[in-house]
């Protein structure tokens, strides 16, 4: 199953921009609330993705 989220780009020349992404929930290793600020960090095989949605919203989408 895929879920659609809003990625917050955190590095490079486009840092701070947002874009819509689709993630296969089978590929998610873990997710945790961002320590400073809003959003959630999602860990996938190729690295981490920071999204605008809260930890609770992601938990509901995956369940």
Protein language model regions, located:
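Acidic, Ser/Thr- and proline-rich intrinsically disordered linker/docking segments
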Residues: 1-63
